[in-house]
Amino acid sequence: ALYSDDVDVILTATRNGLSNDSTNPADWNGEANATKKDGPQVTYYRSLIYATPSAYGQELAAKVNAGEKLTWEDLDKATWAVQKTSSSAGYIYPSMWLMANYDGKKISDLSNVMPIDSGYGTAFSYAAAESVDIIVCYADGRNDYEASWTLPTDQQDETGKQGMGRSDSIWNEMNVIGVTEGIYNDTVAISKESQYYTPEIVAALQECFINIIGTDEGKA
């Protein structure tokens, strides 16, 4: 998306999609809308902007679930937890979502941002502790922390994630307030400025990589 005018994506990997792909954040919220990993094969995934169970996070969620559009002032008042600036789902695409919806403003324009170097698990633990009002994560990160969300803090789920001590479901407490554009999976791309950028070269590269994928070495 950042360089769509300069490069042509000629192949992209696919992944198992989710049961939900709505761009309306309210459609992701509540136990009845719990996301399942049973969607069709897709070439992209999304990043979601989540309001946490903090008092202010609940205010933001209530507005979105009532069909209201959040203002920049609403978002700027919140404390955000974001990933490294190189993270597609944890920084880049949420920043692009802000740019598209709030007159070009970015994460770096927000007043209260907490950078996290230790991954999404830390973001969810901050959310559970109500230390922040908004976190950003791939769709749907709640699947991966559903079990640990309601475990006592001295226990771990079967994957080793530490319990976060909440009493209500993560689907009820972590509400989506923003949905980004799709983020490509791994791609093969060619520069439109290259002297080799021709339909023939594009077709040859596509055939070449598809053939490689069909070999045992390519699947390794």
Sequence positions of predicted segments:
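Pocket-flanking alpha-helical
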Residues: A1-W28, T122, R142-S148
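Extracellular/periplasmic catalytic domains that process cell-envelope and extracellular macromolecules
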Residues: L2-D5, S19-N20, P40-Y44, E73-L75, ...
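Solvent-exposed coil/turn segments that connect beta secondary-structure elements
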Residues: D5-V7, T14-N16, T52-Y56, T85, ...
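A conserved helix-loop-strand patch within extracytoplasmic ligand-binding domains
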Residues: N24-A89, M96-M99
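Pocket-lining segment of extracytoplasmic ligand-binding domains
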Residues: V64, E68, D76-T198
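Short amphipathic alpha-helical coupling segments at ligand-binding clamshell hinges
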Residues: Y196-C208
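Periplasmic-binding protein-like
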Residues: C208-A220
